[in-house]
Amino acid sequence: MREDLLRYLGLKDVLRAGWVRAGVVSPESVAAHSWGMAVLALKLCPPELDLLRVLQLCLVHDLPEVVVGDLTPHDDVSTKAEDERRAMGDLAPEWLHLLDEYTAQATAEAVFVKSLDKLDMGLQAMRYEHAQGMDLSEFLNSARNAVGEPFRGLLDDCEE
């Protein structure tokens, strides 16, 4: 149990690869991103969705990255899903069903969490642009293209 817990917390040390590639100073960790998604979920989760399930998906969707690392669309992602599934089976087999649900986008909760994933990226891009004077429009455009309403409007409102 002790070793498992320490491995999970290793996600705090895995930096978000997209921010590193973009040259962001002191980029967030994958764990910080998952926390950001969870906070957004608490604030934005529609009442018809199961909030506990949404939070579970937020917190474990990137857990395999403690083993496989954070991959971006610029990396070879041809085996990403199977590598992450294998890693989750090793790390926390009791949560493998959550990763499968998220990867397959099998429920309304999983679809919502995928939108939160992109929303968090877009909001974080705005934070970095403001704090570091960078052009991260690539990330903002990606987020806008990946989310539907009301999140697209929320991104627009936050950018103004």
Label for each model-derived stretch:
Residues M1-E160:
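Active-site helical microenvironments for divalent-metal-assisted chemistry
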